[in-house]
């Protein structure tokens, strides 16, 4: 990835781009046909691929564009991680429940990569970063604008690289060591077609790969459904 321009007026952006420039192996490629999964309200079944830029100002979306100009589209590499990421109570709030009604009104979409996807490996970025602030960016936790300000700025820096389709990152709620099964990706708007739609079902209908329903799977993760 040699030749990436670094903006000296933006410290966070500069550090991220410098790290990517020094370590081109941080850009991972996923081949065409890679199966991906997404959970979203069933009312969007007719048009499931929608890149959102209009997150509220205090959004807790970790990798959204802070300028809200470029939309993002989040997916999971397995149905399990897509379900786990979509039905979690508010972070930092104990004993909060997830409504069973939400599960009944949601669909699980199956998609596939339309072409090679070039994704920045966020975990590898953390390992390779030589500046402390970059580590803070990719490991940040928190709620709302302050908690995710650094992660969103790092995402914004990657959005400026046209060859980058998005980010690859491990799930914080469904971790599978050494496997893509516990990973997510967020795709950036404005690139050549990235995904094709395959099929969808109501979240409550299919059995997951381990034989559990979505409700049983979430309960096994400690999510309280009501």
Give the location of each predicted region.
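Active-site and NAD+-binding cores of ADP-ribose-processing enzymes
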Residues: 2-62, 91-226
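Extended catalytic/binding region for NAD+/ADP-ribose chemistry, centered on the ART fold
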Residues: 61-94
């Amino acid at each position: 990835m040699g030749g990436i321009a670094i903006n000296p007026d933006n410290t966070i952006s500069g550090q991220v781009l410098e790290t990517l420039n020094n370590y081109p192996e941080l850009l991972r490629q996923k081949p065409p046909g890679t199966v991906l999964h997404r959970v979203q309200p069933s009312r969007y079944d007719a048009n499931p691929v929608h890149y959102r830029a209009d997150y509220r100002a205090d959004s807790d979306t970790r990798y959204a564009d802070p300028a809200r100009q470029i939309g993002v589209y989040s997916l999971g590499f397995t149905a399990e991680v897509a379900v786990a990421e979509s039905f979690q109570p508010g972070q930092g709030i104990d004993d909060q429940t997830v409504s069973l009604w939400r599960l009944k009104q949601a669909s699980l979409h199956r998609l596939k990569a339309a072409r090679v996807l070039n994704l920045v490996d966020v975990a590898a970025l953390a390992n390779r970063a030589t500046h402390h602030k970059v580590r803070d960016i990719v490991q940040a936790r928190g709620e709302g604008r302050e908690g995710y300000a650094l992660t969103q700025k790092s995402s914004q820096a990657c959005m400026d690289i046209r060859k980058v389709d998005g980010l690859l990152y491990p799930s914080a709620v469904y971790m599978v060591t050494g496997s893509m099964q516990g990973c997510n990706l967020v795709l950036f708007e404005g690139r050549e077609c990235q995904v094709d739609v395959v099929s969808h079902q109501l979240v409550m209908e299919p059995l997951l790969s381990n034989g559990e329903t979505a409700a049983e799977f979430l309960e096994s993760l400690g999510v309280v459904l009501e």
